[in-house]
Amino acid sequence: MIKRYEACFLFKSEEIEYKGSLEEVKKSLELYGATDIISNFIGERALEYPIKKQARGRYEIIEFSMEGNNLKEFESKLKLIKSLLRYMILVKIVRKINTKKIKRRNFREFKDNIDKENLKSGSKIEVPTSSESADIQEK
């Protein structure tokens, strides 16, 4: 089953090693059947503690889709890359948002706010009923 993954990589800070290792990671992804590869460079930062005698590192986030069976083989390939200090691969969960619930909740909050304003000011502001608001939202 194809899943969407998000991986964070920490490379050595040297420019040449970083570029070479990043290309090696991308080639490995393609080799193991990854699709929709999106790469984002986060930046170079000082590390809180030395990792493999390195005080600085470059962070890269790569999103990709891959079969779950190929992931273990890909991880074993990552362990062989010397200038890769750390990595973390997470399954990216995509959830659908129920907009009807949001509209209802927003209407209730709107109605509650108007009721509070009516109590404070003493004047009456008309609030549409839920069926009237549904008609308005459909238009």
From Swiss-Prot:
UniProt xrefs under CDD domains: bS6
InterPro entries with a match to the protein in the record: Ribosomal_bS6, Ribosomal_bS6_sf, Ribosomal_S6_plastid/chlpt, Transl_elong_EF1B/ribsomal_bS6
Gene Ontology molecular function terms on file: rRNA binding; structural constituent of ribosome
A cellular-component GO term for this protein: ribosome
GO annotation terms (biological process): translation
Keywords attached to this entry: Ribonucleoprotein, Ribosomal protein, RNA-binding, rRNA-binding
Any one Pfam family match given in the protein's UniProt record, by short name: Ribosomal_S6
Source domain of life: Bacteria
Protein family membership: Belongs to the bacterial ribosomal protein bS6 family.
Function summary: Binds together with bS18 to 16S ribosomal RNA.
Name the UniProt record assigns to this protein: Small ribosomal subunit protein bS6
